[in-house]
C-alpha cells in the first residue's frame, strides 16, 4: 500500500497544471479507504477523498485514479448534488484561483482538460460560468459551457467589470 502511494506521488508529480511549481510538488491523497489494483493501474479512494499538489485541491466522496505505464492518465472525482466534487487551483501569473464544482469532475492529463458534469459551476476571479456540463482547458484558459439537452437548464455567465 505505501509503495503504491509513493509511486502515485511520483507519477502525478509529472502532471502539467496551471502553476508550473505545482507539477514539482509531491501529491498527497487522503481518504477513509483505498482499493488498489496494480495490474490495471486503477485505484479508488473513498470517504471524503482529498488530493493536494501545490495549489491544486481536488475533493469528493470518491476519487478514482487511472495510471498507464507508470503515468497518471486521469482522475475522476465523484460527488453528489448535496456535496459536489470540487477542484481548486491557482492560475499562473495571477493572484486568483479557479474554483469548480460539479457532480463529477474528470481531469484528463494528456489533454490538460477538466470536464465537469452535473450542475457544473466554475468561478475564475470575479467571473463565473454555470450549466449542465462545462469543459475547462487549463493550458489555453478556455471554457465551454452547455445547458442540458432538454433546454430546462440554460447556461449562465456572470462577468464583473
Predicted regions and their residues:
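Mature-chain termini and adjacent capping regions
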Residues: 1-161
Amino acid at each position: 500500500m505505501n509503495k503504491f502511494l509513493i509511486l502515485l506521488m511520483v507519477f502525478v508529480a509529472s502532471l502539467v497544471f496551471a502553476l508550473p511549481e505545482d507539477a514539482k510538488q509531491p501529491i498527497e491523497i487522503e481518504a477513509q479507504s483505498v482499493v488498489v489494483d496494480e495490474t490495471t493501474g486503477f485505484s479508488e479512494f473513498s470517504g471524503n477523498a482529498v488530493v493536494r499538489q501545490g495549489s491544486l485541491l481536488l475533493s469528493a466522496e470518491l476519487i478514482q485514479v487511472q495510471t498507464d505505464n507508470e503515468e497518471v492518465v486521469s482522475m475522476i472525482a465523484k460527488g453528489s448534488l448535496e456535496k459536489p466534487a470540487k477542484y481548486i487551483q491557482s492560475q499562473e501569473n495571477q493572484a486568483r484561483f479557479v474554483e469548480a464544482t460539479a457532480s463529477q469532475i474528470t481531469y484528463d492529463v494528456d489533454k490538460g482538460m477538466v470536464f465537469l458534469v452535473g450542475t457544473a459551476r466554475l468561478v475564475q476571479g470575479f467571473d463565473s460560468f454555470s450549466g449542465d456540463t462545462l469543459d475547462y482547458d487549463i493550458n489555453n484558459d478556455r471554457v465551454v459551457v452547455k445547458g442540458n439537452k432538454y433546454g430546462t437548464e440554460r447556461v449562465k455567465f456572470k462577468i464583473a467589470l
